[in-house]
């Protein structure tokens, strides 16, 4: 039976010609007649010449088949290793993740970013100047009224009692935390509490700030000498500037000396430091402790209650915030301005200040004005608080804030915005704009004046300024930028990228010196704290497989876009090292790095297209390696996602497809495959055809790949119609473009080309061949898909690779463990593909070949099941089923 099947194998048709339906007298793809008929001799004496001619034709067919097979190769593979598969699925997932990372709040920063130091929204005027430096604070007492306010309103972070007991026991506490988390106000609260009932309890200067430039040793000397007439029992707050280049942190002996001096005088001191490599030895010692941030919900609740009390004029509450022990709280905008914005806007100790009601959200619709009007309509402070709780949980407001948790100053601003909206002074759009500004202000503070100390003039004693600490100074900044670009990637990938950027920033800052790069000074926990980041376990793509790894994200969807906007719009000198760094990331073989970086490059190009095109897109588009050209194409597509830049991107891609160098045409093809770089689907296909047929099909492989990528879009029917037109084209290059695309359609998995998330019909079939997934999910297209694949099976030069592809499809019917896989798609496609008897004979021959395969024999049971899928019951013959299933 096997020999008969081989003998009955249909003859090879010549050039294909598309038809809507199969004619009984001719194959679907059209034919020029049987090529083998030409082998018949004209006369008995011409047998030798005929044999030679037939042999030459056979060699030409083999050469054509080899050329065709070469065009079905992976165009994304490196020239040095074309046989090595590329992980297109991982690249697609990484690109999708990067787009989600930067989609939140882009182009939506609504307030004036030219003066971020002061924010004016409605009648709210709040100072948020990150350039205030702790070095401007000198020795001086903390006013009693400020201590009173701290006593009434401070919210105790988790572990506060433990911190107080440690301070009481050792007299000295080194308190570590990220800037802006309320660490300074917690220090003041601790000092206020431990000195309240001490020897200086009635002294108006019982808590003092120490000059940060003098350091721990000089503070110890002052305490011992009792300088300035300071009484026993005084509390000292010191914030040394450990992040300045060349500054050495105090050692353990310095701290012991200070603790001894404090004990002798019955005094206390809290040294506030930023977490990081410089302060870690201090925090690891016996005096060290980490200050946890105050809880966001309580911060907002206390601030909101205070604002509403002030504006509502409640006679019971205004001015009488009560004590923290009573569960009341307050706070306002009149706090002190310490270097971290911590002190004056910090936490209230009140618990349960916000008891939100369950009033229906749609009960008070107020357009652009506050819902329900002013306080007269609200009726009472409790009703205002109830409505405030509803407004705070409004999905639109939550999305506009874009931060997982708020720091003290942010909580104060957020509460002020909510209160202003409820009381009628802030409109809806102003509210949302102010909420979006929170992330922008954080980004501004992270970058403003980071390297000011490096640019300081040399000291008057003739010494050169110290620049040896550039790497330590720039690493936190580099980590934030790397996290904005690579958020969602593995922690190790982000950290490695941050070190690369640290090097580039250091070299740019001091090109005459080689930056020192410590190898054992990393502190992952400090990196997370200083960058408002969070770790999470998640999948990481490695060599085509998913493994569980430690991923890292910003604690807020709005932060990545805010960081990139701040970096590109306000800090022009940093562009050069960042561009060099992005080019390095473009060469990274891991898709989770290179594709995320490409998306970020596209977003940066949107903010300044002239610069992005000249420095990133065009140079990489002309690069010799496919990886760099894919990077450029992805960046272009990301820019095309913005309506403001879509026209420019389309003009660039159009010019490249017509007049570009081979590298530029290749890049244009990849950009076209995303479906946004031309005015319509027909224009996209025209451009891909121009690229694919030019220069004898030199770039037909990349053109066909991107035709297949377009089949995942809603305009799939338009693509199939154009493929059918190309199969009937007079030009062989157009025919080859169609045939290669058809074969590639059968060999490409859905998740290699699909941008959709799981949960869509195609997204749920990520490991299916795209041909079968379309047949299963788009039944109206099954006939067109079958006709096109039939044409590839019946064309001489494409037949071999098409049969190999069909075998791959048949083997995907079920998984190794017997569970169904693509059976649904095969059930839709095979009957349309084998409607005629000679097609069924061909399938029979292929199934028998698969059963005889010594390496991967197909079981008789599976062969029988596949035959039943393909051939309707009324057409089956019992003897055929007995022979081959």
PLM region spans:
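Long, low-complexity intrinsically disordered regions enriched in small/polar
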Residues: 3-4, 63-141, 697
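Pre-Walker A adenine-sensing motif
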Residues: 156-167
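Walker A/P-loop nucleotide-binding motif
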Residues: 170-186
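P-loop NTPase Walker A phosphate-binding motif
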Residues: 183-201
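Conserved P-loop NTPase "ATPase switch" module shared by AAA+ and STAND
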Residues: 203-261, 265-270, 274-275
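Amphipathic alpha-helical "lid/sensor" segments that cap RecA-like P-loop NTPase cores
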Residues: 280, 301-327, 367-447
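C-terminal leucine-rich, beta-strand-based interaction scaffolds used for sensing/assembly
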Residues: 438-472, 476-479, 483-597, 601-626
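Extended amphipathic alpha-helical coiled-coil/heptad-repeat regions
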Residues: 570-777
